[in-house]
Amino acid sequence: MKNKALILEYCKQFPNTANLTLSKKIYKEHPEKFNDVEQVRDRVRYYRGNKGVKDKKYAKPHIDYLEKLKNELPKGESEKTEPYYLPKDRKKVLIISDIHLPYHDDKALFAALEYGLKEEVDTIYINGDLLDFALISKHENNTTKHSVKYELDCAKVFLKGLREMFPKALIIYKYGNHDLRFDKWIRLKAPELLDIENIMLSELLSLRELNIIQLDSLQWCYMWDIAVLHGHELPMKSGGINPARAARLAINRPLIIGHFHRQSKDAGMILGRPHYYTYSNGCLCDLTPAYLPINNWVHGFCIVDNGIVTQKEVINGTIH
């Protein structure tokens, strides 16, 4: 083996060994090939690119360091959740959100469901905040609020009734920020319960048995070319004057949201493409909660018919 190949092989085998130490080792093991240790050290420094800028092209051990790091460092992890795509055989969707059981508005909720029956929708999309979970909120608790058990019982009755009303429909339940409170409370306040069977919200509500698809709090849904989010996922603390406009400015694409309890619509454009629209839907809950009795909320929902969105407002139980 030639001296160059010999030294490069040692540099590869011992990339972290100091130049002088490596040179002494090479000379000790191959004294017949070199005059002294200093000659070996000169060549080691040369092939490691330590003698100046012109010799950097020989610094192959630096490439080896990179490969070594690639092999030793654990693979990077991503918390990205894969989006849910509405099946292509679905044609008409009823989107309802912000029911906040048991603080729902009877007239508004039943009017929306009746409209869905009339329109013969094949999909029901609960776009977040089916439940309220006031007692396990991070905000100041109102001890006069209903118990968590009562809220869960109401949700069970609602979901069972919904399945009976729409036996053949695809029903999707997307968690909103209020729905998320339950599982989050278990994980943070009572992690000892996590190994108990059927302790999480989806299990307590028997979603699998009711053939209801559950989407995570941060999971996107796509219906045709429209993204559907609850609204808390967006980088905006409030909806401003027009929540639909605020949402459009945040992500610049066709979108339907709830969360802000207000009905609005806004148009956007991507150069070279047709105009698109963003929508924020009204809620189906009580419009005068004790924590915010004065507000600009409205009751509402929407129908998506083959990608065409029609928003509806409910006033005193009448659809407009």
Residue positions per predicted region:
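Core catalytic region of metal-dependent phosphoesterases/phosphodiesterases
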Residues: 96, 101-208
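Positively charged, polyanion-binding regions of nucleic-acid-associated proteins
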Residues: 1-16
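Conserved beta-sheet core of the metallophosphoesterase superfamily
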Residues: 229-318
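Mobile, glycine- and charge-enriched loop segments
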Residues: 69-106, 223
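Active-site-proximal loop/helix segment associated with metal-binding centers of metalloenzymes
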Residues: 189-227, 231, 238-242, 260, ...
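Structural motif
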Residues: 91-93, 123, 226-227, 254-256
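Major-groove recognition helix of helix-turn-helix-like DNA-binding domains
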Residues: 32-61
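DNA-recognition alpha helix
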Residues: 20-33
